[in-house]
Each structure stands twice: as C-alpha cells, then as structure tokens.
From Swiss-Prot:
Listed InterPro entries: Foldase_PrsA, PPIase_dom_sf, PPIase_PpiC, PrsA_foldase, Trigger_fact/SurA_dom_sf
EC number of the protein: 5.2.1.8
Taxonomic placement: Bacteria, Bacillati, Bacillota, Bacilli, Lactobacillales
Alphabetic keyword roster: Cell membrane, Isomerase, Lipoprotein, Membrane, Palmitate, Rotamase, Signal
Record protein name field: Foldase protein PrsA 2
Membrane topology: Lipid-anchor
Principal localisation: membrane
Gene Ontology terms for molecular function: peptidyl-prolyl cis-trans isomerase activity
Annotated organism of origin: Streptococcus pyogenes serotype M1
Length: 309
C-alpha cells in the first residue's frame, strides 16, 4: 500500500507510537505495567522510545497534523475524507482490511492520514496558484505540451490478454475500434477518450505514449502502474485525431497554468516549502532535545533546528 504510507514527503502514519501524543511531560509517573518488584511508567516508556526512528516520525506527523488542523481545519470536510476512504476501499475490495492491517493502520487512523494529506494538499495548491509564473516556466510547459487528441484505448488486467488483442489489431484490415470495444476489460467498457498531455485521470504512461504518437498510429503494449494499488495494467492505444499545435504559447496560457500548478503539487521540494511556511507561522519550538532534528528537512539553508530550553 505505497500510496497510503506515502502521504507527503517526511510524513508518516499517525498510528505509530500513539503514546507519545499523550505524554505531556517526561515526569509523568502514570503506571502502564506492573510486575513483581517493578513498574513501567509513562515516563519510562517515553524515555525508552523517544529516540527511535519510529518515534521521530510519529512526532513529526503529530506536529504537522496539529499545525495544519489549526490553520486549515475548515478547508477539508468529513465528507471528502469519507469519499477518499471509500474509493481506496473499493479499489482493494475484500482485501482492504488485510492491507490496512499490514500497513499498521485501522480505518480510523487511515482516515486521519487522508485528512492530513488533504489539508496539506489544500495548502500546497493555494500556494501554487498564488505563485508568480514566469514566461520561462510557461515556455517550458508549452514545449512539453501536446494539445487535444482523441484516441481509442484498450485496457487489460492481464498481459496475455493484451498480447492477444495486439495480435488481433495487427491483422490485415483489422478494425481497431471494434476490437477495442470487444476486448477491453475496462469496467465501464469505455474505449474512446479525448484529452491533452496534461490529463491526470488516465495513467501517466498512457498519456505520454499517446502524446508521442502521430495521428493514425498505434502503440505497442503500454504497461502502467497504479500508484494507489501498485497493480499493473496493460494498454494499447491508437490516436485517431490530433489538434495542430498553435505557435504562440499564450493561446494555451490558462491550460498551461493549470498544468504548472498540478506539477507543483507533485514536487516534494515545493511541498516542503509550504509545510515550512506553515510551521514558521505556527512558531513551532522543539522542547525536547530528542526531537531536535525532526523539522530539519523544512529548515531554510544553513538554518538549524535546536531544541528550545
């Protein structure tokens, strides 16, 4: 479950070392375990675990969660979280609970992950939209841009099915569109798509392949990896129509801006920049030396993150 545990750079599940969030002080003597001649207190447990990598990641996640809840709580609804949760659950089907457990998550802790991810995504998107985009950025985006194209796309879960379909469309006089409708294993049986190179609802591998094809040309088998489920799918593409690219990038300025903003959402450095800004606004101070370096990746160059006395 790569996507579930890879929310944003440096942020991990809130399910880990949950006790840390309850430790208000290293002097807390609440007993957790008793035995003959000894007890283990919250303080004992805290001091034993706080220097571990797991504890460092848990504290980082807790800090970022608290900061973004304070600054953006009303920007993400419970309905959005539930919708995202259901989408992932549907993708995994009956194995969802097992995959959650293997990732060290419960339904509730995974929903917390989703919420944190969406809070950060909102902040990143707002920052990206407000950034000044230079002419150089627009020209670079324009150079990589392929305008609207229409393509027949077959999708398969099994590579052998894709190979059989490829042989069928290679036959003399083969009708690609008819074969696509007959053989695709896409759930909705859809085969005709119109999109540009900034499309995000189709697999990135498919969009890249289609962008590189000339009108009337067909691809070989394209393998795509679903980042949400880590499953491979196989595709065969035939581009049936391609719009002529206009010479002036300004003709696509609005669309290019959308593509540039979307690119920033996937940029770890930009994400860290936004997180750093939120942490700075919250005036976060690390009080325990054990956690002195947890915010290092968000510090400005040559800026250290010492523990506060």
């Amino acid at each position: 479950m790569k996507q579930m545990n890879k929310l944003i750079t440096g942020v991990v599940t809130l399910a880990t070392v949950v006790t840390l969030s309850a430790c208000q002080s290293s002097h807390n003597n609440t007993k957790l375990v008793s035995m003959k001649g000894d007890t283990i207190t919250v303080s004992d447990f805290y001091n034993e675990t706080k220097n571990t990598e797991l504890a460092q990641k848990a504290m980082l996640s807790l800090v970022i969660s608290r900061v973004f809840e304070t600054q953006y709580a009303n920007k993400v609804s419970d309905k959005e979280v539930e919708k995202a949760y259901k989408q992932t659950a549907d993708q995994y089907g009956t194995s969802f609970k097992t995959v959650l457990a293997q990732s060290g998550l419960t339904p509730e802790t995974y929903k917390k992950q989703i919420r944190l991810t969406k809070l950060v995504e909102y902040a990143v998107k707002e920052q990206a939209k407000n950034e000044t985009i230079s002419k150089k950025d627009y020209r670079q985006a324009y150079d990589a841009y392929t305008p609207t194209m229409t393509a027949e796309i077959m999708q398969f879960e099994k590579e052998e099915d894709a190979k059989a379909a490829l042989e069928a469309v290679k036959a003399e006089g083969a009708d690609f569109a008819a074969i696509a409708k007959e053989k695709t294993t896409a759930a909705d049986k859809k085969t005709t798509y119109t999109f540009d190179s900034g499309e995000t609802t189709l697999p990135a591998e498919v969009v890249r392949a289609a962008s590189g094809l000339k009108e009337g040309n067909r691809s070989e088998i394209i393998t795509a990896l679903d980042p949400a489920t880590s499953k491979r799918t196989y595709h065969i593409i035939k581009v049936t129509k391609k719009a002529t690219k206009k010479a002036d990038w300004k003709a696509y300025q609005k669309r290019l801006k959308d593509i540039i903003v979307t690119g920033k959402l996937k940029d770890p450095d930009f994400q860290n920049k936004v997180i750093a800004k939120a942490l700075d606004k919250a005036n976060v101070k690390i009080k325990d030396k054990a956690f002195a370096n947890i915010l290092a990746q968000f510090a400005k160059p040559n800026q250290k993150q010492p523990a506060q006395k």
